[in-house]
């Protein structure tokens, strides 16, 4: 049977690239004396996409943001913590400048600037690390130090961290080597006592020892996709000296260690400096005075502290800062819920007294910014449950009484009738 063209000729048409006839493909696109099928078009698109992927890292390297630009971007998403943002901006800039220009400059070897973030729960440590990675468009992964153990023990090996990073970038080693790793709860792997113990501390000092080489820089052999189930597969070699490690922790009790040191240095007897009650130093001010010896006394081993040369301290968030966090950043919590309600065609309004009540509640719980979402979620739960079943609601108003649990959110209907969510 002969294929017929629309112009009436009996010539069978073939793709000029793969040679398939017009009956073997879905579409054959004609050009001047040539034809290309839909399959070859798809293949060309794949080739172009791969080329773009390879070119992208070079483009990024040529446009490294300055510390000012990094700090400015952090300001859009993180409220307060000005000193910490400045320290991070400089450290991150220097790290990627080192990668871009090679580890040496005129024969001088440039050291690696891993970062230690010290601050209470909910002060923004994780958010800072996530925002940095997103801005720089580099792979990012998080690990919880409390789940890590030495190799050979029940728990997560430290090298699993690199495996997670590889998973985030589809096992592209070059891309992973430009990534950021955030290790949370690093204070929880402190040594149980000041003196090294004869018994093995596999989740404390043992983990610190295991992390040493990884953080400083080593070539880690990581199993490819499929892991240890396929031992015949060749391991991927990842150079961790190019990965930026950021460690964070609350370090509860560290302020007491610092206070003890500063009190001792102040002297005793007639030469002692007497401090009045009005001169009482805050916890944040104490943490800002942290020295390596304080961290050693807290339980981190000297070698581990040496691998984290850049230290930034974060202050406990005040009530005013929590109110700002609720509505000022680009992805502020209230803006997120307003966008969610907007998908239902409903306007969501948070009154000023409601924001204050949310902040007060979070302060009472001592959870910092981390506790804000659960408070808002609790206040809006019933409304979010009922709203998709109601067609005429135009606006939902949240006030102080709603946050306190004394009343339901105010629902404003299309006919401009205000009713309580309870159905009054």
Curated annotation (Swiss-Prot):
Residue ranges of coiled coil: none
GO biological process annotation, one example: cell division
Protein name (Swiss-Prot/TrEMBL): ATP-dependent Clp protease ATP-binding subunit ClpX
Subunit structure: Component of the ClpX-ClpP complex. Forms a hexameric ring that, in the presence of ATP, binds to fourteen ClpP subunits assembled into a disk-like structure with a central cavity, resembling the structure of eukaryotic proteasomes.
SUPFAM superfamilies cross-referenced by the UniProt entry: Glucocorticoid receptor-like (DNA-binding domain), P-loop containing nucleoside triphosphate hydrolases
UniProt entry keywords in alphabetical sequence: ATP-binding, Chaperone, Metal-binding, Nucleotide-binding, Zinc
Signal peptide region: none
Binding residues for Zn(2+): 15, 18, 37, 40
Gene Ontology MF annotations: ATP binding; ATP hydrolysis activity; ATP-dependent protein folding chaperone; protein dimerization activity; unfolded protein binding; zinc ion binding
Residue intervals of the ClpX-type ZB domain: 2-56
Family, similarity comment: Belongs to the ClpX chaperone family.
GO CC annotation, single: HslUV protease complex
Binding-site residues, ATP: 120-127
Chain's role: ATP-dependent specificity component of the Clp protease. It directs the protease to specific substrates. Can perform chaperone functions in the absence of ClpP.
InterPro entries the UniProt entry points to: AAA+_ATPase, ATP-dep_Clp_protease_ClpX, ATPase_AAA_core, Clp_ATPase_C, Clp_protease_ATP-bd_su_ClpX, ClpX_bact, P-loop_NTPase, Znf_CppX_C4
Domain of life: Bacteria
Origin species: Sodalis glossinidius (strain morsitans)
